[in-house]
Amino acid sequence: MAGFSYLFKNRAVFPFASYAHIKAWAKRFQTLPELIRRNRRRYRLVKKSACIDERAEIGQVKAGGNKKNLKIGAYTFIGQVEFSLHDQIVIGENVCVNDGVLFLTASHDLKDPEWKHVKSPIIIEDYAWICTNSIILPGVRIGRGAVVGAGAVVSKNVGDYEIVAGNPAQVLTKKRTEKLEYNPCSFLAANRAWLIG
């Protein structure tokens, strides 16, 4: 939701010079520097061939490798994360990726005497939540609405609505609700200033 055109078009409107009008514009000006930074981050990645929806929120991302391997859907929040783009990383819509997450799309073949480079894509489905300091290894698919607990190391696929934690990541007994309608970007102050006032 960081796109200026989207926020301006969908902004909350209040009677001119009313308390709500003045308060909303004060918040908008106060949060403008962060909004500009997030738009620049997204623009820089898109300029290098990444496919990022205008309504996605991009934090301080470190992206090594071919940027065209990165695809991020609408209303997805990406914190301070690191992408290893040797192969595709596809992140769906309404996904929340917290700070410190590392996405690795390549490793080495331990059975090969020449220790060859092996790469494989990572797929994150809609409404997934990847918590702080998790590591997502090559070839992993994280299902719709799945949760990866803080510090988890994910080397195997995570099913829809499953909750995993630990090193290596293990499925917990409880499942997440399947009725998901939230937008992780709507909680950011800059977006709230425009959309709510």
PLM-predicted stretches and their roles:
Residues 115-124:
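Glycine-rich NAD(P)-binding loop of Rossmann-like domains
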Residues 132-156:
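Beta-rich strand-turn-strand
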Residues 1-104, 110, 126-127, 144, ...:
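Domain-scale signature associated with acetyltransferase and cell-envelope carbohydrate enzymes
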Residues 67, 119, 137:
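Short, surface-exposed alpha-helical recognition segments that flank or form part
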